[in-house]
Amino acid sequence: TAICDPSLTLGLPARLTAATGMDAVTHCIEALLSPAINPPAEAVGCDGIERAVGQGHLLKAVADGQDADARWNMMMAASEGAMAFSKGLGAVHSMSHACGADQSLRLHHGTLNAVILPTILDFNRDHVGDKYARLNSAMGNSKESDPADAIRTLNSDLGLPANLEEMGVKRDAIPDLAQHAARDICTFTNPRPASVEDYEDLYDKALSG
């Protein structure tokens, strides 16, 4: 059971608002891009993206934590993300789960998702049919926009790290992280198959942003 009361989030610090908000956005995006067929879940995910990003409620909530309307819409987007990912998640979560499993790093899951998301959007680009056009529409971008670059800009505007290196992930950890990510259940609903070697390359790219 989840109690989804946006008034409980009014005192959440800006950095945590940004990180948890991007966790919700990533849930919605990965659910949309999952190859599993579930049109209702896709529609719910698209609405969550539109609320958080297209309508600017994540940026508004970070700028003013007391903005009750922004908090309500972000709570709705988070709830929609949870409903949408019944369709499956993807390689962003596989990679963030692997990083989060290293307790010595003490890395925040939502921040990891935000930082890794652009790398996976680049990786999946040619394997999602027309879904990037739908994603751009929900985000309030032109159809020709690059959603990966849009997320990089959003992360910067939210004050989140630009890459995994800034979060303390070391290059010598890549082999173990890649093995963990390749075994993660979310890998199986990524629109593009990803091998251990793919994950090694993806971590290398995410380290530098």
Describe the function of each predicted region:
Residues T1-I37, R134:
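A glycine/threonine-rich phosphate-anchoring loop and its flanking beta-alpha core
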Residues T17, G21-A24, V44, G48, ...:
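Catalytic-loop motifs flanking and including active-site residues across diverse enzymes
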Residues S79-N113, D184-T189:
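Glycine-rich phosphate/pyrophosphate-binding beta-alpha loops
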Residues V25-I29, M74-A82, M95, L117, ...:
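Short alpha-helical scaffolding segments that buttress acidic/His motifs in well-ordered protein cores
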